[in-house]
Regions:
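Catalytic Tyr-X3-Lys helix of short-chain dehydrogenase/reductase
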Residues: 2-4, 36
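Conserved beta-strand scaffold in the Rossmann-like NAD(H)/NADP(H)-binding core
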Residues: 12-14
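Proline-glycine-enriched beta-turn/loop adjacent to the NAD(P) cofactor-binding site
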Residues: 16-19
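C-terminal substrate-binding subdomain of Rossmann-fold SDR/epimerase-dehydratase oxidoreductases
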Residues: 23, 28-172
Length: 172
């Protein structure tokens, strides 16, 4: 391998999805959280709380007090991902660099959640329950990836055992 050939102390971290407030807004997690925060702020400016009974819905928009807000548009909400937090993953990278011998590690949570699960948690954060959240978004085929991977999960066993690494931030 390259590191052995050149005598480099270089470890390789295979990092599964890791999220933070710095994540680009074109990623689904940020798209959802930005939309939810924007909707909550819009509703408050209308003098409304987020109770679905305060709104009317059509195919594309949500209406409250005569104003409209566009529904959240998403692609495949049945895709499962192994989502961790960036700070935890940076800690894993630091631990890799502290090792006497370089190695390759999978940095992941070992758990999967669907985009639908992420939506449910995000909407609950603004007091919209699971039975109502479907009114606020729509699945749009334009946002489907042409080569979507349905299920991604990493197994961090080696990193946990050899590095003593454990994620601190849960999905919730």
């Amino acid at each position: 391998m390259y590191r052995e050939g050149y005598g480099l102390h270089a470890s390789c971290g295979i990092l599964f999805n890791h999220e933070s407030e710095r994540r680009g807004e074109n990623f689904v997690t940020r798209k959802i959280t930005q939309w939810v925060a924007g909707f909550k702020n819009w509703a408050e400016r209308q003098g409304l709380d987020t109770n679905p009974e305060n709104f009317e819905f059509d195919d594309d928009n949500i209406y409250g007090n005569g104003e409209s807000y566009p529904k959240l548009r998403l692609g495949n909400i049945e895709a499962f991902r192994d989502w961790g937090h960036a700070e935890d993953y940076v800690n894993a990278m630091w631990l890799m660099l502290q090792q006497r011998d370089p190695d390759d590690y999978v940095i992941a949570t070992g758990e999967t959640y669907s985009v639908r699960d992420f939506l449910i948690y995000a909407f609950k954060y603004i007091n919209i329950e699971e039975e109502d959240y479907g009114k606020f978004f729509l699945v749009d085929s334009r946002f489907h990836r042409p080569s979507e991977v349905e299920y991604l999960r990493g197994l961090p066993n080696k990193a946990e055992k050899r590095l003593g690494w454990k994620r601190e931030v849960s999905f919730e």
